[in-house]
From Swiss-Prot:
Coiled coil: none annotated. NCBIfam families: ATP_synt_delta, PRK05758.2-4. Keywords: ATP synthesis, Cell membrane, CF(1), Hydrogen ion transport, Ion transport, Membrane, Transport. It comes from the Bacteria. Gene3D superfamilies: N-terminal domain of the delta subunit of the F1F0-ATP synthase. SUPFAM superfamilies: N-terminal domain of the delta subunit of the F1F0-ATP synthase. Pfam families: OSCP. It comes from Clostridium perfringens (strain 13 / Type A). The lineage of its organism: Bacteria, Bacillati, Bacillota, Clostridia, Eubacteriales. Belongs to the ATPase delta chain family. This is ATP synthase subunit delta. HAMAP family: ATP_synth_delta_bact. It is found in: Cell membrane. It is a peripheral membrane protein.
Amino acid sequence: MYEYLDRRYALALYEVAEEKNKVEEYLNDLREICDIIYGNNELYEIIKHPQISTVRKKKTFRNIFEGKIDDELLSFLMVLIEKDRILYLREKLKEMEKIHLERNNTLLAEVKSVVPLTEDEVTRLVAKLENKYSKKILLKQEIDKSIIGGLYVRVGDDVIDGTVKSRLDDMKQIMLKRE
């Protein structure tokens, strides 16, 4: 519902980071900040509690992050607190990561397999995907025993499902239609 808004915030921060040549630093800091927020129940409760003032929330963030992150990034967090959007920081981070991939002509390929792919298999798969999409490919591997065998590849909205599980499901559907 708020994807458009998340993207606008992320784009604004990305452009600041790009101007300062600190995109990777900002992305890493945002990941760590998200881990701190969502990994610390006490901090999370302070942030989401409606009766705790914005001033107190900002002070808490300044105490934790001032001097540890870039001032522009801290200002961004203050704006999110002011606009009551700080609980949606993960969404801003995801959008910023998407923008970073787009700006670097890169696509994320999510690959599921039963066993980890060998280095050679990864190299060949990346080469084929780069050839197909004419973009750099960032491969994210996931082990999933439920697929039984084969590969499941998702690049954006495209899915290549070469898993044994999907073949068995297809055969099951054909058998059920015949009965």
